[in-house]
Design a protein with these regions (language model features):
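A short, structured surface patch at a secondary-structure boundary
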Residues: 11-68, 72-77, 169-172
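Charged, glycine-enriched surface loops/patches
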Residues: 83-120, 206-217
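Short secondary-structure boundary segments
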Residues: 17, 77, 146-149, 200, ...
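His/Asp/Glu-enriched short active-site or ligand-binding loop at hydrolase and phosphoryl-transfer sites
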Residues: 36, 160-184
Length: 217
C-alpha cells in the first residue's frame, strides 16, 4: 500500500464501502480503522485487523463508528445518506460518494488524498490495469449481466457501462434506456437477449451461482 509523505499521520478514517476502503488502504493504510463486512474485504490480508462497522445490506452501526473516534467517514450517496447525516450532526466530517464513471473516481481519489494529507496519486498508478490497451480493440458485441433474476445489464449511465465504453467494448445495451428501477441498468427478457445475439455474454459473479441460474433460464 502507498503511504506517501503524510502531513497528518493521525487521520482516523472509516470507509463504509469496499471501494473507499480499498482507496484509503492504497493511499495511507494506517489511516483506515473501520470497514464494511464484505467478503471482498474479509478475504484480503491487509484488512484483517480493521474493525467491521456494517454487515450486508444493513445500515452501519453508528455506535461502533463513534467509538472509533473517526476524523472522516466515507459512504455511498443514497444508501449511507442517513448515517452520514447523523455523523455530521455529531461533528464528524463525512464524504458522500457517487461513482458513475472514471472521472468521478479520479475526483474521489484527489479528494481523499487532500483530506489525508498525502501526495495525490493518479488512477493509473493505483490501478495499473486501468491503462488502455494500444491498437484496435476487437469489436465483438457484448452483453454484461449483473443479475439473473431479473436479467439486469448495464447501459452507459452506470459505473459498469462507463467502464465498458472507456475500454471500447461494444456493449449492445449501452444506449438502451433504463426502465428497471435500477438507475443505469436495463431489465432484459430472454427473448431480447436472443434477439441481440451477442458474440460474448459476461456474467458477473455475485456469489449466487450466477452461471447455473442463468443457464436454467
Amino acid at each position: 500500500s502507498f503511504s506517501g509523505d503524510t502531513k497528518d499521520n493521525n487521520k482516523r478514517v472509516i470507509a463504509l464501502t469496499s471501494l473507499t476502503a480499498d482507496l484509503v488502504d492504497r493511499l495511507n493504510s494506517k489511516s483506515l480503522l473501520g470497514i464494511p463486512g464484505t467478503s471482498l474485504l474479509k478475504s484480503k490480508e491487509q484488512f484483517k485487523d480493521k474493525v467491521i462497522v456494517s454487515q450486508g445490506r444493513n445500515p452501519p452501526s453508528i455506535e461502533k463508528i463513534i467509538s472509533l473516534q473517526p476524523d472522516l467517514v466515507l459512504g455511498a450517496k443514497g444508501f449511507h445518506t442517513k448515517a452520514l447525516s447523523q455523523l455530521n450532526d455529531l461533528g464528524i466530517e463525512t464524504i458522500s460518494t457517487e461513482i458513475k464513471n472514471l472521472n468521478d473516481l479520479e475526483l474521489l481519489i484527489n479528494r481523499i488524498s487532500k483530506n489525508l494529507g498525502v501526495d495525490n496519486q493518479s488512477l493509473l498508478s493505483l490501478v495499473p490495469n486501468c491503462e488502455k490497451t494500444t491498437g484496435e480493440f476487437p469489436s465483438r458485441s457484448t452483453i454484461v449481466l449483473v443479475s439473473s433474476a431479473p436479467l439486469l445489464s448495464p447501459n452507459k449511465n452506470s459505473w459498469a457501462g462507463s467502464l465498458l465504453n472507456e475500454f471500447n467494448i461494444n456493449n449492445l445495451i449501452s444506449d438502451i434506456q433504463s426502465k428497471s428501477g435500477f438507475d443505469g441498468y436495463v431489465t432484459l427478457s430472454p427473448e431480447v437477449l436472443l434477439e441481440k445475439n451477442p458474440d460474448n455474454i459476461v456474467l458477473i459473479d455475485t456469489g449466487n451461482d450466477m452461471q447455473n441460474l442463468f443457464l436454467s433460464k
